[in-house]
Amino acid sequence: SDPQRYAWLGFGPDGNEGGLNWDVIAAVGQAVKAGKLTGPLKVRKTVIGGWSGSGALTLFFANTFHMRERMEDGGPIFDAVLLGEPGWYPRINADSGDLIAYDVRQRPAMLDVPMISVNSSAPIEFGMPFRPRADSDDPKGRFRAYEVAGADHRGAREPTFNNPQEDCGAALSDFPLHRYYSLAIDHLKRWSDEGKA
């Protein structure tokens, strides 16, 4: 990168304009779905998803921009949504305020594509504001919530804390949460392809 060349670009007073997230997610999704970034590979379906912080961005995009940002033919950019324990709700841009805890906007919206949410017991244990809605097969709001009891937010494959102050000496969970996330991906694919949850 060239700091002098790009010095004129501004991203808010603290150098972080989160409002650009939504434009980037939409533009990249549209380009991928249109086959502009995939070379000889053909795109059959696009899925948006993430875990923890990126899960929160996924929830925000799905709730706020999924029905607004579309392909040229009016169809969805993303054919399915996978929410991985979004524990907070990001601001729409650098100037907006935080949502209050348990704001209704932290609940997954009714969309025209299937959505699966995977959660450990952390949202309950730590009072995270995200709460899934009821399971539904309604074509205007297909949704499933997989709540995995006994799992922690990070899962067994995550590295241990590097900060000794955060390590209380107790054994970390060996619960294979990643397997449930993989299972959710498989179920979401089947639901999107075959219409079976």
Name these PLM-found stretches:
Residues S1-A197:
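C-terminal His-loop and adjacent cap/lid subdomain of alpha/beta-hydrolase
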